Amino acid sequence: MISPRVNTRVWQRSISLLSPQAAKTESNVVTKERTYIENLSKDIATSRFRLVDENGKIASITVQPDIPICIKKDCLVSIHNLNHLSLSYKWLNFWSNLIKFRSFKSSLFHRIIGSSVLEILAAPNFQTSRRPFDSSRSLSVLNLTGTKDWNVFGKDSIIAFEQNSSLEIKSPIFPSARSLVSNSSKSQLPRKFQILNGRGNVLVCGGGLVYSIELIDESDKILVNSRNILAINGQSQLDIANSVERQELHVEGAYVGDSSNDTVAPKFIKNQTLKSAYGHTVQFFKRMRSWIRNQYEKRYIYGVDSYFMKIKGPRTILIQTHEMTTSKDNILTKLTSKGHVKKSNVNDNGVNLEKQVANDVNSKIIELANRPSLFIATVSQDGRVDFQSTSKFT
């Protein structure tokens, strides 16, 4: 559970859950904020992106007349005030995203524009096909002022954005800015990211909970797992590249000298050629042993799926926890738990047990399908929206 007001100091670093109070910075970052439906007759100077619930699962977007809003496919929940509404679609960085993410779905957005103020609800409703039990997702709002760039990582991280002449979203294939500053292969960010610059509002989502980390100055540094970074900002792409250094947490292989003179050959070897060959052979096996040990520790002790990035300030970092969901609909977990599968007698054969498990699965599916999964939204006169489960009305 994310608290809407957290501002904790750790050493000289401000770590927060993206407090709803706007900070006096160039780019305001908000993850969670109590949001109420705005009065549609009220004049709005700019589009507003706000989070409705405490868990950051749904966002409210208030849109000016004649301003297009692009929402990711399957993430549109509802639209309020349908006067002269126009719906179309937009491909965002199609070719670059197709090459980089190997998916065209990350580029497909619904384009919405109306002649009056619109109130739109959006949520990360898309599903990933790689893992059957993916992590829960939370939303975050980026209010860009045009003075800093944001790098957002992940193919499904951008949920919605307002389409204006100032906001620009790019998906570079070749790291031009980073290649100018990188003197080694360790000074680089993950390649799969999109660049946000200009002025406007962008709705992003991350796995699990989303946290904000404020690095105060250049002496303020932090190590971040590459899998957990959602977004990072900076004055420019060159500034972002200069602030990141890749670090793999594994033990380097022990140094083995190039010379074989340190290896003493057995006394029975008199020939100098054989002594030299013996020394080179021993040296080869030492290097091989060191390499095998290094690869073992790197793969099985420290892991190869991710690496750490040392990031220095001043800048803002968005971190995602990637916590896994333990859904009530996990049928296999319920069936294998105590009491759902009865122990068979010694004389029971495997066929009867298989039929029994199949019947338990079918009954559990029917039970889950009959559970109420609808929610009732009540809009009061002051514009406040309350969500209640239908189970409370039965």
From Swiss-Prot:
GO cellular component terms given for this protein: mitochondrial inner membrane; mitochondrion
PANTHER family listed in its UniProt record: ALTERED INHERITANCE OF MITOCHONDRIA PROTEIN 24, MITOCHONDRIAL (PTHR36959:SF2)
Segment annotated as transit peptide: 1-111
Protein family per UniProt: Belongs to the AIM24 family.
The keyword Mitochondrion belongs to this UniProt entry's keyword annotation: yes
Misc remark: Present with 2290 molecules/cell in log phase SD medium.
Tagged with keyword Ligase: no
Gene symbol of the encoding locus: AIM24
Name of the protein in question: Altered inheritance of mitochondria protein 24, mitochondrial
Gene Ontology biological-process entries: inner mitochondrial membrane organization
Traits of the deletion mutant: Increases frequency of mitochondrial genome loss.
Record-linked InterPro entries: AIM24, AIM24_sf
Pfam families: AIM24
Localisation per UniProt entry: Mitochondrion
Domain of life: Eukaryota
Main location: mitochondrion
Keywords on record: Mitochondrion, Transit peptide
Signal peptide coordinates: none
